[in-house]
């Protein structure tokens, strides 16, 4: 019998993202939309330490098996009309990363996408992505975002999802 392992995370509100650096999106531990297998635990599997939603580790999903997985993500940025014209971004990016905090095997990014923001006054820039990837126990996954505005920008909302199957014993 095939068993699905699914972790579906959503941000609890806006996060300020600094300019010109990839930032690991953090997800609250109490607001999981779906995580029955505890792939997004507050108690970190590598250290046993419990972290809060403000810790960068709140952005990690910890697969528990070697598997071929499906990743999905969504980002929604603020409307750039909120920024002076000289401070606006020319592009936003997002990517998936194995070990984004260099805890185990080293930073390994994949599926980087680069997009122009929507014109000012037409709403926030929203992008989705999916990507298949091999996952391994002990190697966390993360979803990172980037912009090139002159000032920090609001990531209004984000989601990060991982799913894979295992043969049940």
Regions from the language model: what does each represent?
Residues 1-169:
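Extracellular jelly-roll beta-sandwich "head" domains, especially the C-terminal globular C1q domain
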